[in-house]
Design a protein with these regions (language model features):
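Phosphate-handling catalytic cores of nucleic-acid transaction enzymes
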Residues: 1-492
């Protein structure tokens, strides 16, 4: 990017309308958050080795920790209320910024663990099948004998042998790539968990949103289908991290279904905008740090109930008194702002869930920092970090979520100016703008936005274009002149 003093007016204007246009809250970066030691060490090494932004490395690390826990841990407050570590994170970032590299080491560790578990369970299933086949042969012999003699003792022996048969272990599938409602519900019924870690994935479809909101809250879910086996999910656990292109990210978090389903309040959105990505070439991670990351994820996986035939109860993570007081004070502050005329009123549904988000983030940091058998409560500094992270996500909710007509107006103004500046039009007709933005905004919204932009001298208005008396076709309307037109530039 050019230094500000040498930057052409067109690019200055484009940066202004992308980042600083009046009416938007400033979205804060996660790189400003002070992280605890182990998390900071691993995330910094991932960012450096993979030549990706620190923010994306952190956004890949935290869901990986939650995924490795597989729903085994619960954060418990002094009043007895519990919170699982289910996480929904939606990330928008431009192509080439390094989204796939943020997850590749964690995915490799999960894949290796799953492959090893497959081998162990496959061998065990072969032994079970052989034992069952021997029982079947014995039952066949006894069945012939019973048919001849009718002895009750033979029949009892047949029943006893049938009860000795053992079922096969289910083959574990930790990660899920299909985002359809049918795939998610079936995976939850089969395994009790559904985990997606997608570096360039598909955001949730409408039919899956209700299922995911209930899973995030840990509610009991029953499925009754004529075309598939029925099932009940008693204690669902879901981790859904999707990194995608900015256009898909913005469209998704502003769809009415996303807002009305309650998924918005349960999702942590993050849009990475800084185009100054690291210039270094990617390199392998430091073996010592990678070994510690692998040890951490594998210890969590092995301690979880996933793949266990006799699962234990949930691991409880208590919260220290100081940390709970810190959470309560922040919660009261957020609630007071949401009830007033502050910007938090616009996203009060998300504000109501912020204490839960903070507890889940604190739980993930706790699992990362301490051994799996650690029994001490979450300390206040760790809770402070989680609260800071929650407020960063809040800033992205405020920045990118369209909730009322004021948001529509601001977004429409930005869309008009970005379209004109990116195409580098010297002049453009009102009709062309309405056609270009017809899938996002009503024609009346575009007209109002143009009126505002002209009144603020962001655009200059020319005389209406006339097509001539008797000539067919829609009038072209006003001609708008771009004061930032770059004669030596090109469109992009």
């Amino acid at each position: 990017m050019y230094p500000t003093l040498l930057e052409p007016p067109r690019f200055q204007a484009l940066r202004f309308f992308r980042d600083n246009f009046p009416g938007y809250q400033n979205a804060q970066p996660l790189s400003n958050v002070t992280l605890p030691s182990f998390t900071a060490m691993v995330v910094r090494e991932i960012a450096t080795a993979k030549a990706i932004p620190f923010d994306l490395a952190l956004l890949g690390f935290l869901p990986s920790i939650a995924a490795a826990d597989c729903g085994h841990s619960r954060v418990v407050l002094s009043d007895g209320s519990t919170n699982s570590l289910s996480l929904f994170i939606a990330v928008g970032a431009d192509s080439g910024i390094g989204k796939s590299r943020a997850l590749e080491d964690s995915l490799k560790i999960f894949s290796d663990w799953e492959h090893s578990a497959h081998e162990v369970i496959t061998t065990e299933n072969q032994n079970r099948n052989f034992a069952n086949s021997l029982i079947d042969e014995r039952i066949k012999v006894l069945g012939k004998k019973y048919a001849k003699t009718g002895e009750q003792t033979v029949l009892e022996e047949i029943y006893r042998l049938k009860n000795q048969k053992v079922a096969e272990h289910s083959i574990p599938h930790l990660l899920l790539s299909d985002a359809t409602e049918a795939a998610l519900s079936q995976h939850l019924i089969d395994h009790g968990i559904a985990i997606r870690l997608e570096s360039d994935g598909v955001l949730l479809p409408k039919k899956a949103m209700r299922l995911m909101t209930k899973s995030w809250s840990g509610e009991r879910i029953s499925r009754h289908r004529m075309t598939a086996p029925s099932g009940v999910i008693e204690d669902p656990f879901v981790v859904d991290l999707v990194m995608t292109q900015p256009e898909f990210f913005r469209d998704f978090i502003n769809t009415p279904d996303f807002l009305e389903s309650g998924l918005m309040a349960r999702t942590l959105p993050y849009y990475y905008q800084d185009m100054l990505c690291p210039r270094e070439h990617p390199r392998p991670m430091d073996e010592n740090t990678l070994g510690k990351l692998r040890e951490k994820l594998l210890s969590l996986l092995n301690a979880s109930n996933f793949c266990k035939q006799n699962p234990s109860g949930h691991r409880t993570i208590p919260v220290s008194k100081d940390a709970e007081e810190l959470l309560r004070a922040n919660c009261q502050n957020w609630t007071a702002q949401a009830k007033s005329a502050s910007p938090l009123y616009r996203v009060r549904e998300f504000v109501a869930r912020m204490p839960q988000h903070a507890l889940r983030l604190a739980g993930c940091l706790y699992l990362a920092e301490y051994p799996v058998n650690y029994e001490y409560p979450i300390p206040a500094p760790l809770m402070q970090t989680a609260l800071h992270m929650t407020e960063v996500f809040l800033s992205h909710v405020l920045r990118w979520t369209i909730k009322d007509y004021g948001d529509v107006h601001v977004e429409c103004c930005r869309a008009i100016m970005q379209f004109i500046l990116e195409k580098n039009f010297s002049d453009v007709s009102e009709t062309v703008l309405k056609q270009a933005l017809r899938h996002r905004f009503k024609a009346a919204d575009v007209s109002i936005a143009i009126y505002y932009l002209v009144s603020q001298n962001y655009l200059y208005e020319g005389l209406p274009e006339f097509t001539g008396t008797g000539k067919r076709g829609r009038p072209a309307g006003r001609t708008l002149f771009n004061p930032y037109y770059d004669q030596t530039g090109c469109s992009f």
